[in-house]
Structures are given as structure tokens and as C-alpha cells.
């Protein structure tokens, strides 16, 4: 079961770039909450707490606005400062317990393929549908002992219970191959090339 991260929020009535700058100066993050059964709710979150919460992939958040019932939410769009890394803005999708949600989950290679080969994923992450309280942190691809030329398709992946693939099952998830090597020039050829270049240069002089 997913851990729920609790974040306190303040509802805000000021909008626009100027208001957003003032919020960030106070080490807070402007955010908007939207869902199927309510109008967008504009809130302000604590900057440090939000940064820590977003270190987790697909964190399930409980947004607690004073005087209101806490609302479960998933971050759907996170804007970060390119240079300093702090969170500039967050879009939050409100959800309900028992609901299935569409999320992107990272792929990770596990195990070692056959000696002399390497395994590579075709995607950093894939889109799946999962139970709200059981969103996988990562989907592993076991390549133990696989030989060069092996192809693993999305449909081959072992997904956790309650999780289903949203992409094309025939898309390639990972491949096993021999690493590409640079052609090595032998010393004799290299010497002949160098001598030829020297003679050509001398002739021009």
C-alpha cells in the first residue's frame, strides 16, 4: 500500500506572475488542484515540504486546506527552476480511494545478461494504469543470462497485480546486444599513413 504524504495548503485568491513571484520569495509553491467533480482550487504549498514529497515517483499526497476535508491528489505537472532545482509550480489531480489512475512508471534493468553483452531499455518509463494505493515505484526487466539478439517487448513485462499496460504490447521495451566497438587501426597502417602525410606536406613546402 502506498504511503500517503501529508501537505498543508493555503487557499489563494491572487494569481498571475507577480503573485507567483511573491509566493516563491516566501519559500512557498503556487499550485492548482483539479478533478472531475470540482472547479480548480488554487493553493499555496510549503516549498521545502513539497520538494521532499516530489523526490518520490508518483507520490500520493493528502492536501490539507484549513477548514476543509483533506483531498488525495497526484502531481501531474511539476515545473522546476532549471538552475536551482526548486519547484516553481505544481498541477495536482485530485483522486479518490479505490480509483484506478494512469501514471508513468520508470523501467529498470535487473540481473546480468550473457557475458560480453549489454542490455538497454528503449524507454525510460512506460504508461500504465494502476490502483491508486498500489502504484508501482518501478517496473523491473530481468535480463539474467539473456543472449545477444534478445528482444523484450512491453507485452513481456511482468506487471504488479492490479497494474495494466496502456501502451502497445508489441513495442520494444529492451534489447540485449554486443557493445559497439570502434575499429582499431594497426600500428603498421598508422605508421604508413603518418609517413604519407609527412611526405605530402614536404612536397607542398
Curated annotation (Swiss-Prot):
CDD domains the record matches: Ribosomal_L25_TL5_CTC (cd00495)
GO molecular function, one term: structural constituent of ribosome
Stretches for region Disordered: 178-205
Protein keywords: Ribonucleoprotein, Ribosomal protein, RNA-binding, rRNA-binding
One Pfam entry name: Ribosomal_L25p
GO cellular component: cytosolic large ribosomal subunit
Extent of Acidic residues compositional bias: 182-197
Domain of life: Bacteria
Membrane-spanning ranges: none
The keyword RNA-binding is assigned to this record: yes
InterPro entries, A to Z: Rbsml_bL25/Gln-tRNA_synth_N, Ribosomal_bL25/Gln-tRNA_synth, Ribosomal_bL25_b-dom, Ribosomal_bL25_C, Ribosomal_bL25_long, Ribosomal_L25_dom, Ribosomal_uL5_bac-type
SUPFAM superfamilies: Ribosomal protein L25-like
Single biological process term from Gene Ontology: translation
Cited function: This is one of the proteins that binds to the 5S RNA in the ribosome where it forms part of the central protuberance.
Subunit structure and binding partners: Part of the 50S ribosomal subunit; part of the 5S rRNA/L5/L18/L25 subcomplex. Contacts the 5S rRNA. Binds to the 5S rRNA independently of L5 and L18.
Entry's family note: Belongs to the bacterial ribosomal protein bL25 family. CTC subfamily.
Descriptive protein name: Large ribosomal subunit protein bL25
Lineage: Bacteria, Bacillati, Actinomycetota, Actinomycetes, Propionibacteriales
Gene from which the chain derives: rplY
Amino acid at each position: 500500500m502506498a504511503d500517503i504524504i501529508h501537505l498543508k495548503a493555503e487557499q489563494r485568491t491572487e494569481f498571475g506572475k507577480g503573485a507567483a513571484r511573491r509566493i516563491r520569495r516566501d519559500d512557498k509553491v503556487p499550485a492548482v488542484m483539479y478533478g472531475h467533480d470540482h472547479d480548480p482550487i488554487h493553493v499555496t504549498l510549503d516549498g521545502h515540504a513539497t520538494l521532499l514529497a516530489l523526490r518520490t515517483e508518483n507520490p500520493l499526497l493528502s492536501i490539507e486546506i484549513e477548514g476543509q476535508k483533506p483531498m488525495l491528489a497526484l502531481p501531474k505537472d511539476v515545473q522546476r527552476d532549471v538552475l536551482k532545482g526548486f519547484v516553481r509550480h505544481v498541477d495536482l489531480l485530485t483522486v479518490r480511494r479505490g480509483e484506478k489512475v494512469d501514471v508513468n512508471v520508470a523501467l529498470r534493468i535487473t540481473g546480468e545478461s550473457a557475458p560480453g553483452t549489454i542490455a538497454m531499455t528503449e524507454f525510460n518509463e512506460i504508461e500504465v494504469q494502476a490502483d491508486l494505493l498500489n502504484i508501482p515505484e518501478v517496473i523491473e526487466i530481468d535480463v539474467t543470462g539473456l543472449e545477444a539478439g534478445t528482444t523484450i517487448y512491453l507485452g513481456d513485462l511482468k506487471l504488479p497485480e492490479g497494474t495494466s499496460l496502456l501502451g502497445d504490447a508489441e513495442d520494444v521495451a529492451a534489447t540485449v546486444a554486443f557493445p559497439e566497438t570502434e575499429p582499431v587501426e594497426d600500428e603498421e597502417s598508422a605508421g604508413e599513413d603518418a609517413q604519407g602525410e609527412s611526405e605530402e606536406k614536404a612536397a607542398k613546402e
